[in-house]
Amino acid sequence: MKTVHLLLTGLSINILLLSLNRLTSFTASYLQPFEFLRWLDFNAMIPIPLLSILLYYFLLKDTVKGSAFKKTALYSFLFVMFITGVYLFGASSGDHEVTNYLNTRFCDRGETKSTLCNIISYNDDEFSHYVYYLGFVLMNLVLIFMEYNVPRQKEMVKKDYIFVSLNALFIGL
């Protein structure tokens, strides 16, 4: 369980980084050339989601390590679903962050009613969110099904339940 605790702590830290990135002015400056993005958009598009994906992958890998389940057709199917979730999660991050930047900078957060701004606003506030949640749900469902098919060999003790619960509460906030 030590590896799981470390990975869950990594996810909690990643959420903290995402919150600091979004809710503070530390990352409000522009990237060059042409002020093509803000640092906050860049961080939320590449390093933060990448860290999330890596942590999810390592959780999946830890769940099935040494298991004969990895040789089954169900595992192959679930792994393809995981890759699909990763792709959708990544595509949505790219779509959302760029259109969020454009919407904020050129469309007055959706208040400008031109055709271009309507398209940007829709990609920012709706389409990218649908794709994000589909990817996020797929990755989580795969982890749940993997855990179901390869139950932990060692029983969780009270300390494990406390640690997992604290991480869940932090992530849930």
Predicted features and spans:
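Alpha-helical transmembrane segments of multi-pass membrane proteins
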Residues: 12-29
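Transmembrane alpha-helical segments in integral membrane proteins
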Residues: 52-60, 132-154
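Hydrophobic alpha-helical transmembrane segments
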Residues: 117-141
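Transmembrane alpha-helix/helix-exit interface in multi-pass inner-membrane proteins
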Residues: 88-108, 144
